[in-house]
Amino acid sequence: MRAVFITSITGWIACVLIGLEILLPYIFRKNRLSVWLRTAANAASAPYLKRLWPHYWLGYLLLVLGVIHTVVPMQAGHLRQWNLTGLWIATVALLLLLLQGALGLWLQDPKLVGRALMRSWHYWLIFGIVLLVGVHVWLNG
């Protein structure tokens, strides 16, 4: 019973934090959203990559939550009661999340060559992760 609770809590917290994680780069950049949210004044206070520190740490937290959400039910051993397709989809989403974390680490380097391509991959990976997590929640939530 405790494993189900921990798995459920970490999964739903991660779902909410994924949405926040996606919003943070847009909040820390001067645009219509940051003006509307009144965060635009902070958007020019430091270099963009330095302002993104909450985005970085939230990404690390999402990795930890994803691993906990994966390991706890595996150790409990009650996986047969869940939709196996949803579990495989969640496995692919976790692997993409690990790749996303690696790309995020590279993107923190201000001297990175090919930043535009890496940011594009970073964007499309989160799109894929959100899609896979949504299907996982639909099948197993």
Task: Map each language-model feature to its residues.
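Membrane-embedded alpha-helical bundles that constitute the cytochrome b-like, heme-associated redox core
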Residues: 1-141
